[in-house]
């Protein structure tokens, strides 16, 4: 009798253990950890193909922070992505103009020169009041109302191309204007502008962080192909990013097709410095 009683009481306990282990396995798979950072300018949620759009949204939800092209998404989609705990930054090209933008014809007269390696793009005169006003009071207002967590601003490198005081002040005017929306601003590239603003003490009043492409990798635009960065350029960028960090700016890296061993090196570097990085599959940033 005692033996029979022991067998009966043990069986439910065994079932409970099995159920617990299965449940643990299920939730572990379902709640895979998010990636830290991703830049996805080449994808959108408005293709009109429901399954594809849903796949895009799910991809973005798998990151803690993403950069996307706001015109490729609806405010409702941005809210859906954010509901999963993802911070969403919107891309805004302040130093150049692409010929596929609906406002291209209105502003091409303010362009300065073609953008090398980017056939559809032109450097812009950022000192022009009409361009400044459009970025600040039209696009800035429109995009901020979509519920973005911040702006990702491209091509302050215009100051490297045209190192004139009016260009420098024009960029500062645009950044100051965008600050009215109380959103963090991250500058993509623009090391010459960033370092000058650090030197004159205005950096932290203008923007909050920097993203630098190709610290550890580089792009051969003739193919295109993706290679390891040369030592001299890598050392320059590392010194520059240390200056940015010391100035109180957050730092992000975007690399292209870093292989496994190089990715481990970048992981160690970013972990040591407190930076975030994204390993892009291609220039299309999909």
Predicted regions and their residues:
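Short, low-complexity interaction segments enriched in Ser/Thr/Pro/Gly
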Residues: 1-2, 26
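Bacterial N-terminal signal peptides that target proteins for export
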Residues: 3-14
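Bacterial N-terminal signal peptides
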Residues: 14-23
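Sec-dependent signal peptide cleavage junction
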Residues: 24-32
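Glycan-processing catalytic domains of CAZymes
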Residues: 31-286
